[in-house]
């Protein structure tokens, strides 16, 4: 199990993250979504052990970076950037270097090359690679480590639809092997198809956790005009899957059982004057993103 706790994290006087508590069981694919510059990459770097302070804790099966640094680094890998690649080396040399660092057998390198369909160009120098080829190599370097936790920041960047489909297939197979995979991405429809859960980062914290299975469920969004009714509702229906949206009086509820909906609507009928808006339907990552980050854009110049 991976546990991440961040009381606060700042760059100088600028606070970037606070009050973040995440618990992830194996195996799982987690999507991480937020606009640029709001802390996604910082969170990835913290999980990778590249950023730290006294208010940060990352535990993998009760081990941490402070007391088990090398072991954690062998078990958690972050995808490198294309700028980290060496132009004068071949893709195969990159993979062999990573395999040696993680004590991986050469046969597994060949397996990764085959799985990612890179044989045609893997022995060429990286300087000859297209953007998509470089991105696939960066992903292959993660896969070849065979780490338990894989951190991917915009892994689909620069890839055509065929390659997005290929990498998505590999990600699913890695999950089936028992991995935890965390993907920071703007391709929301892709996350809809591969992620078990998607974390939406807003106002320096995880504002909403959306489970993939919720796409098969009805969702009810309620905005309360009365704080007292909001508290009363959350107490009465505390066993339901609820997420706070853009303010403390706005809830997103996922329902599998229509009987749950009946009981909620009965409550709503008795308290209708204290509810300012009500939306019912099926949501996906794209709709949730728009509501979280652009719900107040209407009417602006």
Give, region by region, the residue ranges found by the protein language model.
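ABC transporter nucleotide-binding domains
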Residues: 9-16, 20, 26-177, 182-183, ...
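Flexible, glycine-rich phosphate/dinucleotide-binding loops
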Residues: 85, 207, 215-216, 284-287
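ABC transporter nucleotide-binding domain
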Residues: 169-252
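Short, charged/small-residue-rich alpha-helical element at the C-terminal edge
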Residues: 220-292
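Generic C-terminal helix-cap and adjacent flexible tail
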Residues: 293-301
